[in-house]
Amino acid sequence: MSTISYTAVGRRKEATAKVKLQPGTGIITVNKKPGETYFNYNSEYLSTLRGPLLALGLENDYDLHITAKGGGIKGQTDAVKLGLARAICTMSSEKRESLKPHGYLTRDYRAKERKKYGLRKARKAPQFSKR
């Protein structure tokens, strides 16, 4: 007998997170570590990734099994948030209407701008010398 699970992928900058949502007691596991340990007990990160569940009042009804790769912790947190919102939408399409106004289903497309030739960074030019 297999348990019901919902899976989705979220991305932000260079970070990618696969989120698996299963009925449970609210345990968060990131890369086989407890969520609090992985995010260094930072309450801001933990509340950000729990956002979609808190908006629907489901924070203690589902366990999260997350695989996060790339980027930094902040990017991974936002990737998890998007993946979680998408997983909730696959669970029930009625929940989409309550997640959409909060912005949980919107992917933040901003990424690092590429370096251009003749410049030191993406936009930083070498110092101009008149003579």
Swiss-Prot record:
InterPro entries: Ribosomal_Su5_D2-typ_SF, Ribosomal_uS9, Ribosomal_uS9_bac/plastid, Ribosomal_uS9_CS, Ribsml_uS5_D2-typ_fold_subgr. GO terms for molecular function: RNA binding; structural constituent of ribosome. GO terms for biological process: translation. Pfam families: Ribosomal_S9. It is found in: Plastid, Chloroplast. One of its GO terms (cellular component) is cytosolic small ribosomal subunit. Transmembrane segments: none annotated. Its main location: plastid. The keyword Manganese does not apply. Keywords: Chloroplast, Plastid, Ribonucleoprotein, Ribosomal protein. Belongs to the universal ribosomal protein uS9 family. This is Small ribosomal subunit protein uS9c. It comes from Emiliania huxleyi (Coccolithophore).
